[in-house]
Amino acid sequence: MSPSAKAAGMVAFAQARKLNNRDRIMDAAATLFRERGYLPVSIEDVAASSGVSRMTFYRHFSNKAALAAALFTRTAAAALPRFLSIRENDYTSRTAVHDWLTTVFAVDQANRNLLRVFIQANVVEPGFSEIAHGFIADIIAGLGREIDAFAARQDVAVERHRWLRGWLLIYEILDQSNHAARGLDPSCDPMVIDILADRFSAFIAA
């Protein structure tokens, strides 16, 4: 092996190891946060659980808030296709919309412990809510590629009212699904999905 090839291999190995450490830290944090909640878990706990030093932790995350933000971003990226899946069905059909919302609520129910973590982080970490609101914007942008009702742009004055209506609709869906996952009444009432399906259908038909 030539010196240049050997050097390239070492660089690739170091990069892969760095990415692996980052994933290990995030995986360990997700497990600890689910088990104990966000506030009680320390950086030392996460480092120990992931098998890395504090120095290695700080190579990837400046603080616990940065870790929570990265974990939310990763979770949101994995969840986005589920929220956009309505595009692949007959979104003009109320039945299809209802089935889609039922799936959204069911998955949030399965991930309720992680949702609690993000709620706690949102309360104590400045800037976390902006990241969460960015996820709503991503959903709207994705839906807008196929569904005209969501194609309005927030930075165009004549379209902003329509965009805000779509933003509030998606926010309400996420909010009620979150509340239902934690067993909060009346969000866990099955009629909530019925009402949201009606509102979604009315929005895209208007």
What is the predicted role of each segment?
Residues 24, 28-36, 78-89, 172-183:
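Solvent-exposed, amphipathic alpha-helical segments
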Residues 70, 74, 84-110, 162-166, ...:
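Hydrophobic alpha-helical connector segments
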